[in-house]
């Protein structure tokens, strides 16, 4: 019985990169790009790369409270309690920085 030759054999990868070899290369490149992108996004959010991460011992600049915080605290002209006061524990510098920067 004579064997038939299939010229459109997808399993045959020649030097031109046709068939399955070419498809596998494209899939590999796409997967690598997606994985690298996800790693960069995760590292940026964690502060491992970029300037968004908190530095140990570094002073952060004072920022103006947002209008939402102003309304909650009685308006922009209301004086905040003295440091160390237990009157409003939600308005400490640490909690304000935490609310602003996550």
Swiss-Prot record:
What does UniProt give as GO cellular component? Answer: membrane
- Principal subcellular localisation of the protein: membrane
Task: Give start-end positions of Polar residues composition bias.
Answer: 93-102
Which keywords does this Swiss-Prot/TrEMBL entry list? Glycoprotein, Membrane, Transmembrane, Transmembrane helix
Q: Topology relative to the membrane, per the entry?
A: Single-pass membrane protein
Regions of biased composition (Basic and acidic residues) lie at 56-73
The answer, when asked if Membrane is one of the entry's keywords, is yes
Compartments it resides in: Membrane
Name the UniProt record assigns to this protein: Uncharacterized membrane protein ECU08_1550
Which organism is the protein's source?
Encephalitozoon cuniculi (strain GB-M1)
């Amino acid at each position: 019985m004579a064997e038939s030759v299939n010229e459109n054999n997808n399993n045959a990868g020649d030097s031109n990169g046709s068939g399955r070899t070419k498809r596998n290369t494209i899939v590999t490149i796409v997967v690598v790009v997606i994985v690298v992108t996800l790693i960069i996004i995760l590292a940026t959010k964690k502060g491992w790369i970029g300037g968004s991460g908190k530095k140990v011992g570094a002073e952060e600049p004072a920022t103006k409270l947002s209008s939402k915080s102003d309304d909650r605290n009685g308006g922009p002209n209301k004086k905040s309690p003295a440091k160390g006061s237990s009157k409003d524990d939600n308005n400490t510098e640490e909690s304000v920085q935490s609310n602003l920067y996550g």
